[in-house]
Swiss-Prot record:
Keyword Methyltransferase listed: yes
Uppermost EC category: transferase
BP GO terms, sorted: DNA restriction-modification system; methylation
UniProt-recorded Gene Ontology molecular function terms: DNA binding; site-specific DNA-methyltransferase (adenine-specific) activity
Gene name for this UniProt entry: ceqIM
Catalytic activity: a 2'-deoxyadenosine in DNA + S-adenosyl-L-methionine = an N(6)-methyl-2'-deoxyadenosine in DNA + S-adenosyl-L-homocysteine + H(+)
Sequence segments annotated as region (Disordered): 1-21, 33-62
Function: A methylase, recognizes the double-stranded sequence 5'-GATATC-3', methylates A-? on both strands, and protects the DNA from cleavage by the CeqI endonuclease.
Extent of the TPR repeats: 283-316, 361-394, 476-509
Taxonomic source organism: Rhodococcus hoagii (Corynebacterium equii)
Protein name: Type II methyltransferase M.CeqI
């Protein structure tokens, strides 16, 4: 817990609304309306009863600060999984009390300023922790205590400018620099000289976008915690903030496989596009919108937005993003059975992708899917296997899907392939660990078809899981694969049924895309 003394702060208000403070004489925690009680004394050298003068650290060490605070580190009770946290109650120079909770392990801000903190965490027993800290310290395992100066405050305008720089690094995919900005800004948020809900909402949105960026190289799912922290009311009268809110919300829906919801949110964001003046940000949005239309099999709209994105990205020399656009254009040609044109696009992009391992691996994976579409399973196997050797692709979420694809094409060629069975179980376990529903179903259907020889009841139940989650694209693809399997087994009635299902849901996705227009 961090409780700031009144050094360097505005005078304490009278009556209700006063905050707990550390007495300079007794070293006790004084709480309005409660008797004075002993408080853990700070462990810095020198007398602890004397309050440091404004802007002066103990023993004459000069520092710029807005006050002093007692900082307690502690382990949370079991319901917070025993992670290390620091809880603080900070008195700002602008007569406002700030509450927050910092995770020591990741240095990420988990709380917001002001009363909203309690509103956000009331259902998670955070008030209980606060009471334990303030009035029942003997029940909480305090791990350390120290007197530290509060860092220099920062204005919302300067913090907002920092966040803009951070977001630019994210858009340009400068991962290391973006990570540095994340760590720096995560600390600066605690030093706001006055609360600004718009800046905090902007911070939460960019933090979520950062998580989407780093997900490419981490085998874990992105959680919408920072997105949920945004006060939607703050976006109503701010066009740029509204754009970012709907854009990021759309990305999360797409990430979760809810393509219809994602496209709806993207179309709302498109109405706010005039408030965006950064051309690279516009290009990123058009790319995501084109990607969403591709998922709906609305290829005309997808190509239009992807070409707009390429034009804007070329002006900013964002090579890797141009490669991603070209990857989708080639995938569209594959879906339209224009295999020769798709091959030229893929090979051209592949030649430029060597310096970008993440995109390089995705291109190899896309080439594997292209070969699956053409029933060239051996070539598909080679591309999937090569993709897993590039960069950190094998450790990423997309890498789990590639492992499932590789196991699938190997088992389709030889159902007794022990290495393929091992790889399938590895992909299945990884997908289960992070609740990657689509990959879990793909693994289960591969197992049912090629290891358990087409058990109808298992196939039906797994496909139903996709329908319940509205994964219509995945349903269509897997139904088509099942139809091909039964066709090879000369079970034409079953093959016809599943092919009809595949066509139905492919058409359904096209209709949804038209409705969004």
């Amino acid at each position: 817990m961090v409780v700031t003394s009144s050094a360097g702060c505005a005078s304490r208000p009278r009556g209700r609304g006063r905050w707990p403070r550390l007495s300079r004489r007794s070293g006790c925690l004084e709480v309005p309306g409660r008797p004075r009680r002993p408080f853990l004394r700070p462990t810095v050298p020198g007398p602890t009863s004397a309050r440091p003068r404004r802007g002066r650290a103990p023993h004459g060490r000069s520092t710029r600060c807005t006050g002093w605070r007692v900082q307690l580190s502690f382990s949370c009770p079991p319901f917070i999984k025993n992670r290390q946290f620091q809880f603080y109650l900070i008195r700002s120079p602008f007569s406002r009390v700030g509450y927050g909770l910092s995770d020591v392990n990741s240095s990420s801000l988990l709380g917001l300023w002001g009363i909203k903190f309690f509103a956000c965490w009331e259902n998670s027993n955070m008030i209980y922790i606060f009471k334990m800290l303030g009035y029942n310290q003997d029940k909480l395992p305090i791990t350390s205590e120290r007197l530290v100066p509060m860092a220099s405050s920062i204005s919302p305008e300067k913090l907002g400018a920092k966040i803009v720089e951070w977001y630019s690094c994210i858009v340009s995919r400068e991962v290391e620099q973006a990570e540095e900005y994340k760590q720096e800004i995560g600390q600066l948020v605690n030093q706001l000289e006055r609360s600004d809900e718009k800046v905090l909402s902007y911070y939460s949105l960019v933090l979520f976008r950062h998580q989407l960026l780093t997900e490419d190289v981490q085998q874990k799912r992105v959680e919408p915690t920072s997105l949920q922290a945004v006060n939607v009311e703050d976006t109503i009268y701010d066009g740029l903030l509204a754009f970012l809110y709907y854009f990021m919300s759309g990305q999360y829906e797409f990430y979760e496989g809810r393509y219809q919801s994602a496209l709806r949110l993207y179309k709302i964001a498109e109405q706010k596009i005039d408030h965006v003046h950064d051309q690279s940000e516009k290009a990123e949005f058009y790319f995501r919108l084109g990607e969403s239309y591709f998922a709906h099999h609305q290829y005309t709209f997808a190509v239009s937005y992807l070409e707009q994105a390429i034009d804007l990205f070329e002006n900013n020399n964002f090579i890797w993003t141009i490669l991603n656009c070209r990857l989708l254009l080639a995938a569209i040609k594959t879906e339209l059975n224009l295999f020769d044109e798709a091959e030229k696009e893929y090979q051209s992009a592949l030649a430029d992708a060597t310096p970008y391992p993440t995109t390089h691996a995705l291109l190899l994976r896309a080439l594997g899917l292209n070969r699956v579409r053409q029933r060239k399973l051996y070539e598909a196997e080679m591309y999937f296997a090569e993709a897993l050797t590039i960069g950190d692709h094998s450790k990423s979420v997309e890498g789990l899907k590639t492992k499932a694809n590789l196991a699938n094409v190997r088992l389709r060629q030889n159902a007794n392939n022990a290495e393929a069975i091992r790889l399938l179980q590895e992909a299945k376990a990884g997908a289960t660990a992070i609740h990657l529903e689509e990959c879990m179903v793909r693994c289960a259907i591969t197992e049912a078809l090629y290891i358990n020889e087409g058990r109808d009841e298992r196939l039906t139940s797994e496909l139903q899981r996709l329908l319940e989650r509205e994964f219509y694209t995945e349903y269509s693809e897997l139904a088509e694969e099942i139809a091909e399997y039964y066709k090879q087994q000369s079970l034409l009635e079953k093959a016809f049924y599943y092919m009809k299902e595949a066509l139905h849901y492919r058409t359904n996705m096209k209709m949804i895309g038209v409705e969004q227009q």
